[in-house]
């Protein structure tokens, strides 16, 4: 029967039926007739809805596929086939928007023309018997019942068949075909006899007769009757299953399951060593922007034109000098590189027409900074086979680094609001179905909470830089192209604004493989004095390049302006993911949605509005040494977004490993909090796997510190 179902029905229908059976704890390998019945019912529901639309006059029309009018509003909302939570969300939404009475049981469809829920029945017995069972179960005059049989009979409430004759004939023909195909394979008799009556749990607890026989048939292997199986389940040891598996393994496997108690776990050991350093591809909280409002200059939108216009807004340039050298680099080369950028920008301004792109002269300082001719010569492996001591060159173990406070400050800053709007999500047309209406409402509420967030600025900055760098890497492979670091936003008043953070100079970029590296030098403006946290800026050479006048409450004050310069590198695959940083918005929105869904299923109505508009309610944000931190729903949105953005900015193998391994420990701790009496073996091995990922990455070290705070408060 299972093979027949998979051949006979559309794969999407089969997948939905599998999910439904899994949701109710039923095994499709055993209950094959049930599997076939669910697929049949799903197909009838879909056929009932197919091709039926409502036109602008509110009339029901039938439109065949590939018709340009197929964008009309669907007449039927399909509820059957969705998971229970989503199905109830749709039903609640329909009731809220149409005023329909909420049904006691999940119906199959909603008819927008007749404004009523529909229960579809497909029976192998007499239609009138099945109709009465359905009506008796539903006990509601507001749900319309429509029953089909495999013999071509049908029955509907008040003989109102809803659909036209031709649409119903299609359904009957399909059911008759299914019956014939089953009969040809000798499956029909078993299928016909296996139909159960419509019973509800409230009405009947005792299992007798056919149901009892079916229960006995549906047991796992090696159980003769339901009582034996019940006795086994009642005496089931939670961890016995693992011990049973271990006993079947090699005698060398010696794993004793230890109970996991509140006193069992220890904190994760963070490494000692010098403080960790900033390793993001661009400055975050320390970045400074030179901005122009309402840009309307010639060539507006061309990065080089925008950059020159932004540079002209600053008048405090001075002779640059080094204030914080890079310990291992030739710092004079970094200084000369910045002077070269200024000189070549000045040359452009003196030209009659500004070019769209600027390729830098290949000076000795840029060749050094971009690693030109520094890569070891590649030799074909076939030419080396005879060399007896051929080996990969030795590489040093990475130096262990300790957690530093700057990374927590960076994260806190990313969660804050700025005075600019960084995203405007395009409208995607008018909502037709209730689920689209809910989705749009959630998206709009979420956007309002995060559009001013600094993490959103980092997204747009990252998208721009990675897109520009990948384009230049492909279009000007041999050139040292100058790439302005630009972002665009709107002020609170709605005025457009173009911002310049600094410049990138790209090295040679013959990128054949996804992991081939392109070197670049970044030069970024900042007001942060690097001497305050020199360990953070280990990889940078910092110049003082000017003085900026800042307005404050006490009047104007002058602050030194710095330029953070470093050599860096990236690859095609990293730039590809950097270009897609907007995904962070989607990920954090989905996390918020799951919180709303949980609340909605408890209250049995969509709670989106209450969720975002109840300003007095606080939500857990995360763990700190002081305990569970709470905040408004907006703060939760921004914190989740910042976490997602930092996962992208600080992506690394260390983060992948720590996330995967610490999750295992987290699940055990959560099981303990839920009083599930978890057992573990080789807990020391798990700690080892977690701690080998804690090397020098600031974001991983911060996450490990947060995890320790969670352990402390979770196990009190």
Swiss-Prot record:
Q: Does the keyword Manganese apply?
A: yes
- Pfam families with a match to the protein in the record: Flu_PA
Cofactor(s), by name:
Mn(2+)
Q: Which residues bind Mn(2+) 2?
A: 80, 108
GO CC terms in record: host cell cytoplasm; host cell nucleus
- Gene Ontology molecular functions: endonuclease activity; metal ion binding; RNA binding
Tell me which Gene Ontology terms the entry assigns under biological process: cap snatching; DNA-templated transcription; symbiont-mediated suppression of host gene expression; symbiont-mediated suppression of host mRNA transcription via inhibition of RNA polymerase II activity; viral RNA genome replication; viral translational frameshifting
Q: Which Gene3D superfamilies match?
A: Influenza RNA-dependent RNA polymerase subunit PA, endonuclease domain
Q: Where is this motif: Nuclear localization signal 2 (NLS2)?
A: 184-247
Location of the protein in the cell: Host cytoplasm; Host nucleus
InterPro entries per record: INFV_PA, PA/PA-X, PA/PA-X_sf
**How does it get modified post-translation?**
Phosphorylated on serines and threonines by host kinases, including human casein kinase II.
Q: Which residues bind Mn(2+) 1?
A: 41, 108, 119-120
Question: Cofactor note from UniProt?
Answer: Binds 2 manganese ions per subunit.
Short motif (Nuclear localization signal 1 (NLS1)): ranges: 124-139
Q: What is its EC number?
A: 3.1.-.-
**Keyword annotations of the record:** Cap snatching, Endonuclease, Eukaryotic host gene expression shutoff by virus, Eukaryotic host transcription shutoff by virus, Host cytoplasm, Host gene expression shutoff by virus, Host nucleus, Host-virus interaction, Hydrolase, Inhibition of host RNA polymerase II by virus, Manganese, Metal-binding, Nuclease, Phosphoprotein
Its family remark reads: Belongs to the influenza viruses PA family.
User: Any idea what job this protein has?
Assistant: Plays an essential role in viral RNA transcription and replication by forming the heterotrimeric polymerase complex together with PB1 and PB2 subunits. The complex transcribes viral mRNAs by using a unique mechanism called cap-snatching. It consists in the hijacking and cleavage of host capped pre-mRNAs. These short capped RNAs are then used as primers for viral mRNAs. The PB2 subunit is responsible for the binding of the 5' cap of cellular pre-mRNAs which are subsequently cleaved after 10-13 nucleotides by the PA subunit that carries the endonuclease activity.
Query: What does the annotation say about its assembly with partners?
Result: Influenza RNA polymerase is composed of three subunits: PB1, PB2 and PA. Interacts (via C-terminus) with PB1 (via N-terminus).
Protein's UniProt name: Polymerase acidic protein
What is the phylogenetic placement of the source species in the record? Viruses, Riboviria, Orthornavirae, Negarnaviricota, Polyploviricotina
């Amino acid at each position: 029967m299972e093979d027949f179902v998979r051949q006979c029905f559309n794969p999407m229908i089969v997948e939905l039926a599998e999910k439904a059976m899994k949701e109710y704890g039923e095994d499709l390998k055993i209950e094959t007739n049930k599997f076939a019945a669910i697929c049949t019912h799903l197909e009838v529901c879909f056929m009932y809805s197919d091709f039926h639309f409502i036109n602008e006059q509110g009339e029901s029309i039938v439109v065949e596929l590939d018709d340009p009018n197929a964008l009309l509003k669907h007449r039927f909302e399909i509820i059957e086939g969705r998971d229970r939570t989503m199905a109830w969300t749709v039903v609640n939404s329909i009731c809220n928007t149409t005023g329909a009475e909420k049904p006691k049981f999940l119906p199959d469809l909603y008819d927008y023309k007749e404004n009523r829920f529909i229960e579809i029945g497909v029976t192998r017995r007499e239609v009138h018997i099945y109709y009465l069972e359905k009506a008796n179960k539903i006990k509601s005059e507001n749900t319309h019942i429509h029953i089909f049989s495999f013999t071509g009979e049908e029955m509907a409430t008040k003989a109102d068949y809803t659909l036209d004759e031709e649409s119903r004939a299609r359904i009957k023909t399909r059911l008759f075909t299914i019956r014939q195909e089953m009969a040809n394979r000798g499956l029909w008799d078993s299928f016909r006899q296996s139909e159960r009556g419509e019973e509800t749990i409230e009405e009947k607890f005792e299992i007798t007769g056919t149901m009892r026989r079916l229960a006995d048939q549906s047991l796992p292997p090696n159980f003769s009757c339901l009582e034996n199986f019940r006795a086994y389940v009642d005496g089931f040891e939670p961890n016995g299953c693992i011990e049973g598996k271990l006993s079947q393994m090699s005698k060398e496997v010696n794993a004793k399951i230890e109970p996991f108690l509140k006193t069992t776990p220890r904190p994760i050991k963070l490494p000692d060593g010098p403080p960790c350093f900033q390793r993001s591809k661009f400055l975050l909280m320390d970045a400074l922007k030179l901005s122009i409002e309402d840009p309307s200059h010639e060539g507006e939108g061309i990065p080089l034109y925008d950059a020159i216009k932004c540079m002209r807004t600053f008048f405090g340039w001075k002779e640059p000098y080094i204030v914080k050298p890079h310990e291992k680099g030739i710092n004079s080369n970094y200084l000369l590189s910045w002077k070269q950028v200024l000189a070549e920008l000045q040359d452009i301004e003196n030209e009659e027409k500004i070019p769209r792109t600027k390729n830098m002269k290949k000076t000795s300082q840029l060749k050094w900074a971009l690693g030109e001719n520094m890569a070891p010569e590649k030799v074909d492996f076939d030419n080396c086979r005879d060399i007896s001591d051929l080996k990969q060159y030795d590489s040093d173990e990475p130096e262990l680094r300790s957690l530093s406070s700057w990374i927590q400050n960076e994260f806190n800053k990313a969660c804050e609001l700025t005075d600019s709007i960084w995203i405007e999500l395009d409208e995607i047309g008018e909502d037709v179905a209730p689920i689209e209406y809910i989705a749009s409402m959630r998206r709009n509420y979420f956007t309002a909470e995060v559009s001013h967030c600094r993490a959103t600025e980092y997204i747009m900055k990252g998208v721009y830089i990675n897109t520009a760098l990948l384009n230049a890497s492909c279009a000007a492979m041999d050139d040292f192209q100058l790439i302005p670091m630009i972002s665009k936003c709107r002020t609170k008043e709605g005025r457009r604004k173009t911002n310049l953070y600094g410049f990138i100079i790209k090295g040679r970029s013959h990128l054949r493989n996804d992991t081939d590296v392109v070197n670049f030098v970044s030069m970024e403006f900042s007001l942060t004095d690097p001497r305050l946290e020199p360990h953070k800026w280990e990889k940078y050479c910092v110049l003082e390049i000017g003085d900026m006048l800042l307005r404050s409450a006490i009047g104007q004050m002058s602050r030194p302006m710095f330029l953070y310069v470093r050599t860096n590198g990236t690859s095609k695959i990293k730039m590809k993911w950097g270009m897609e940083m907007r995904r962070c918005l989607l990920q954090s929105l989905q996390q918020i949605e799951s919180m709303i869904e949980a609340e909605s299923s408890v209250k049995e109505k969509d709670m989106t509005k209450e969720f975002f508009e109840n300003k007095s309610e606080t939500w857990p944000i995360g763990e700190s040494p002081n305990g569970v931190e709470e905040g408004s729903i907006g703060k939760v949105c921004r914190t989740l977004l910042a976490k997602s953005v930092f996962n992208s900015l600080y992506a690394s193998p260390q983060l992948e490993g720590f996330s995967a391994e610490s999750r295992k420990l987290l699940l055990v701790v959560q099981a303990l909090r839920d009083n599930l009496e978890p057992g573990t073996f080789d807990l020391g091995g798990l700690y080892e796997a977690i701690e080998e990922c804690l090397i020098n990455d600031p974001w991983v070290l911060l996450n490990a510190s947060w995890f320790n705070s969670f352990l402390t408060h979770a196990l009190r």
